[in-house]
Structure formats: C-alpha cells, structure tokens
Amino acid sequence: MPPKPDNPSPDASPEELSKYMLAVRNYINLITRQRY
C-alpha cells in the first residue's frame, strides 16, 4: 500500500497545492491499479 500524501498546510502556496493534487491523483491510481 503506497503512503498517503500529506495534507498541505493551510498556508501552502498554489504550487504546493498543485503538487499535492498530483500526488493524490497518483496515489489513487496506484491503489485502484493494485485492486484489479
């Protein structure tokens, strides 16, 4: 099971937020791929 991405801090920059969204998307893809 891949580690879940850390939640961005409340004062995270837009760049950090977009990086976080990408990490979450990759994380979800990894999980769904492992299931099938």
UniProtKB/Swiss-Prot annotation:
Record-level Gene Ontology MF annotations: neuropeptide hormone activity; neuropeptide Y receptor binding
Keywords per UniProt: Amidation, Hormone, Secreted
Pfam families in alphabetical order: Hormone_3
Annotated organism of origin: Petromyzon marinus (Sea lamprey)
CC terms in the record's Gene Ontology section: extracellular space
Compartment list: Secreted
Xref: PROSITE patterns: PANCREATIC_HORMONE_1, PANCREATIC_HORMONE_2
PANTHER family linked: NEUROPEPTIDE Y/PANCREATIC HORMONE/PEPTIDE YY, PEPTIDE YY-RELATED
Modification Tyrosine amide occurs at: Y36
Protein name as catalogued: Pancreatic polypeptide MY
InterPro entries: Pancreatic_hormone-like, Pancreatic_hormone-like_CS
Superkingdom of origin organism: Eukaryota
Main location class: secreted
Keyword Ubl conjugation: no
Family: Belongs to the NPY family.
GO process terms (BP): feeding behavior; neuropeptide signaling pathway
